[in-house]
């Protein structure tokens, strides 16, 4: 059995929700984003744990993700954030999931399916305030869809939302987006709707002016991406493996393809069974660390498809039975998605989501030190 395993700690998820709850007002609801298999944390198990922890609602990207939750017997409120085909819109109505809407055709399909099924369709009006992806953009378009909504009596505007594009780097632009959004909320309410307003994802959820009726954290749930809560959130992922070889090499010996590492001294090299075929970026070659016996060991040589190599010369006593941490905590040390993302010239999201199917996942109820 391959010993490269992604452990997901359920108690960390619940604990992170508790920390977030303590830092937002009591009257602000919490919608957790569990798209993309809960950012690589198992969508069904994570959603169940978060629901038990008191989360108000969940968001996914596509109707297929909502269907997975419904098929697992999870009947909590679910919002589908992304665009959708006619068939996907009809499926959203059938499984009682709320759907983001931003044009007249989407409204018409929801209305038709709701009428056919004898139920109410639930929708969240998406406002494009500067992202230029999907959403109602501009006052005229907003007036048009609000007017058209009068012809769709079986579609309830359950929510209204937007998405900030630079909340972590540009507060001034985010405030401009928020002003556009607030005007849209006023218009929707003046038209007779009473939607839940939400805009703040992880980057903005700690800023009171952006919280509205509900916040919508994603990556923060999983233990990262909230500078204001640094040290209080716990990584819910831990990627571990064990050595497949430990060997001594001489000064002048090279390690790996391209001879990119040549030993300057007699060294001890540990080979680990993980590589870019598992989603571990080749850009981490000769840069990243792993943790063994609570200490950092530097990668040497190129990341291969199936293996990486690390220098453990200064860490005595390492054996083939030692657990090696690729992402996560060991002792007082921690390798975070942010750390690896900076080295790989990417974002923490890609690190979290990048590990592939041949990395086994183990759901753990409680972290054991």
Feature locations, PLM:
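Active-site-proximal beta-alpha core segment in soluble small-molecule metabolic enzymes
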Residues: 4-8, 12-15, 22, 26-196, ...
